[in-house]
């Protein structure tokens, strides 16, 4: 009788715990998440696959908040309408822009609007202001959006009539703690590489094989301390002689933007992981440290001299990079593209590759000397702009790029690529351009497919080790990946001048039965194979209370005896708690 009472008591405890778990789960259903929440589009508005709900707490934005509106990269253009503006040499002031609620397949975001003629919208500068719904201290709005990266901020109006744009207090851009620079806007990613807009499939953060990003300082040409952003690829400590990409921001920008709003680190992460790019370091410049507008010739000469005489020596002294100019690239957007053209003009010997994005060039027949032409014939040049980029359709760009530089490069047989991206003078264009530059232009190095010389497509049992021999030089080995997951270096051995990898049985036992994909990553290539794990035949049939369970000979875990009320109560508690946890 006493055992029955104990059993009933334990069941009661289980029931109480289950109810409490249920109450906790239900209480969270109605919780409001500040920041952004991304789900499938159920608004019935637009053809976008996703919807994003923005929620901000006005008490975190100061006192006497009168109203909050959303602004950011939520203006779109129809791709079918872009050619007219290009062909007619029109300013993008005349282009029709569409809101997020009007999105259709084939549209793409273009940063800010070129005009504010549509009176159904409110604007702050060139950005549509999306009204938010107030509920006590919370403001919210939901936008249907296609898959890409977006920047945004909140336009806050106060009771005294003043207004300011602020970042999301729960999702600010990452700050450089050395000088307090940040990317000015909050940002987020929608969707994934499989459904991203054209040119954006490499921008998404990885969940493995990721590089790191940090900030450093150097002494500039004028004796002052200036900041650099430094991206280091995954496995940096294992390699040497890394190639280097120097990136310049646009007018008013700084060293934080390229790897946040521009996703440059993510793009390189993905390209390296997929064998599309040799291991490379990125150095993001802070050209706003120097005086000048960014379009002034004297200022750009200073920038060029500073990167050659100060930045490159600092990087080569403190980081494991190649000192060969053919392993360096310089690219920039907008004003940074102007800087890139100046670097190409006065320091062509210092780089092997130049990227001029959304920028006119300060170059003419007087500058394009026979000496410069001779030096550029061993370089690669990439030029790009957006479909409705004022850097493409304004008269300055047309005269300097379309009418002068491209014909000149053709005439002198200089290797160049000119590409138009979907977008305006904005990050959608610049991310797409950088992806092409890194993936298709850089390094003149095709990805090397190394061979598995022994151990390819092998069948092994769970209790066995796996030995793989390759033709990869040991000095080039970087990492081992199984099923898209990097394997901890301490869990396998690497030996030989041409590497042999041994996966011990302890590692094999952690993998599931069936086929697996193994990839050995080298500095400039990879080797890959499949292997198959079959079940260990050394198993026991264990009979306990008329129940048969199959267990390894090394371990045998039995279910509790069901005729023991005490153990049954504990078992019931375990099952119910497991179910509650799932709820």
Q: What spans do the regions from the language model cover?
A:
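N-terminal cap/lid segment of alpha/beta-hydrolase-fold proteins
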Residues: 61-62, 133, 182-237
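C-terminal catalytic histidine-bearing segment of alpha/beta-hydrolase fold enzymes
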Residues: 384, 389-448
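Intrinsically disordered, low-complexity repeat and linker tracts
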Residues: 23-31, 446-459, 480, 525-578
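Aromatic-rich carbohydrate-binding modules that target alpha-glucans
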Residues: 45, 53-147, 157-190
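Surface-exposed, short loops/turns at beta-strand junctions within beta-sandwich domains
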Residues: 144-148, 505-514
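Short beta-strand element of the alpha/beta-hydrolase
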Residues: 229, 240-252
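Primarily recognizes the serine-hydrolase "nucleophile elbow" in alpha/beta-hydrolase
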Residues: 317, 324-375
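Cap/lid segment of the alpha/beta-hydrolase catalytic domain
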Residues: 251-318
């Amino acid at each position: 009788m006493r055992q029955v009472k104990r059993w009933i008591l334990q069941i009661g405890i289980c029931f109480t715990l289950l109810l409490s778990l249920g109450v906790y789960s239900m209480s969270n259903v109605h919780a409001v998440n500040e920041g952004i929440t991304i789900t499938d589009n159920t608004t019935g508005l637009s053809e976008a696959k996703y919807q994003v709900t923005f929620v901000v707490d006005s008490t975190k934005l100061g006192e006497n908040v009168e109203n909050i509106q959303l602004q950011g990269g939520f203006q779109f253009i129809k791709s079918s309408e872009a050619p007219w503006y290009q062909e007619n040499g029109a300013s993008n002031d005349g282009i029709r822009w569409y809101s997020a609620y009007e999105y259709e397949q084939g549209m793409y975001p273009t940063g800010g609007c070129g005009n504010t003629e549509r009176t159904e919208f409110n604007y702050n500068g060139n950005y549509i202001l999306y009204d938010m719904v107030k509920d006590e201290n919370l403001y919210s709005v939901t936008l249907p959006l296609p898959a890409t990266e977006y920047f945004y901020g909140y336009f806050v109006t106060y009771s005294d009539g003043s207004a300011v744009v602020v970042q999301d207090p729960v999702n600010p851009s990452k700050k450089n703690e050395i000088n307090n620079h940040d990317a000015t806007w909050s940002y987020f990613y929608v969707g994934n590489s499989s459904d991203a807009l054209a040119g954006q499939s490499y921008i998404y953060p990885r969940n493995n094989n990721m590089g790191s990003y940090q900030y450093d300082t150097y002494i500039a040409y004028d004796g002052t301390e200036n900041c650099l952003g430094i991206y280091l690829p995954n496995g940096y400590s294992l390699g040497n002689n890394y190639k280097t990409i120097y990136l310049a921001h646009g007018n008013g920008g700084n060293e934080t933007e390229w790897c946040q709003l521009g996703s440059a680190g993510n793009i390189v992460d993905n390209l390296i992981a997929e064998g599309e790019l040799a291991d490379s370091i990125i150095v993001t410049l802070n050209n706003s440290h120097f005086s000048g507008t960014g379009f002034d010739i004297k200022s750009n000469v200073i920038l060029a001299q500073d990167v050659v005489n100060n930045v490159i020596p600092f990087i080569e002294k403190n980081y494991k990079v190649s000192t060969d100019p053919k392993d360096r690239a310089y690219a920039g957007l907008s004003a940074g593209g102007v800087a890139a053209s100046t670097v190409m003009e006065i320091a062509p010997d210092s780089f092997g590759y130049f990227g001029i994005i959304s920028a006119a060039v300060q170059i003419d027949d007087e500058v394009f000397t026979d000496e410069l032409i001779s030096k550029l014939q061993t370089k690669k040049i990439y030029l790009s702009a957006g479909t409705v980029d004022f850097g493409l359709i304004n008269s300055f760009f047309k005269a300097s790029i379309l009418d002068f530089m491209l014909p000149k490069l053709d005439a002198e047989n200089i290797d160049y690529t000119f590409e138009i991206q979907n977008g305006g003078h904005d990050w959608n264009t610049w991310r797409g351009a950088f992806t092409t530059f890194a993936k298709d232009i850089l390094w003149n190095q095709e990805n090397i497919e190394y061979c598995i010389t022994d151990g390819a497509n092998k069948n092994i049992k769970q209790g066995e080790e796996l030995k793989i021999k390759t033709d990869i030089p040991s000095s080039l080995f970087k990492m081992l990946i199984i099923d898209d997951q990097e394997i901890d270096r301490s869990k396998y051995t690497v030996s030989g001048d041409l590497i042999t990898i041994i996966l011990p049985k302890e590692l094999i036992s952690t993998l599931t039965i069936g086929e697996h994909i193994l990839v050995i990553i080298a500095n400039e290539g990879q080797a890959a194979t499949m292997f198959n794990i079959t079940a260990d035949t050394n198993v026991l049939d264990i009979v306990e209370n008329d129940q048969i369970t199959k267990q390894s000979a090394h371990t045998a875990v039995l279910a509790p005896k069901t005729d023991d009320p005490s153990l049954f109560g504990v078992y019931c508690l375990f099952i119910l708690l497991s179910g509650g946890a799932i709820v």
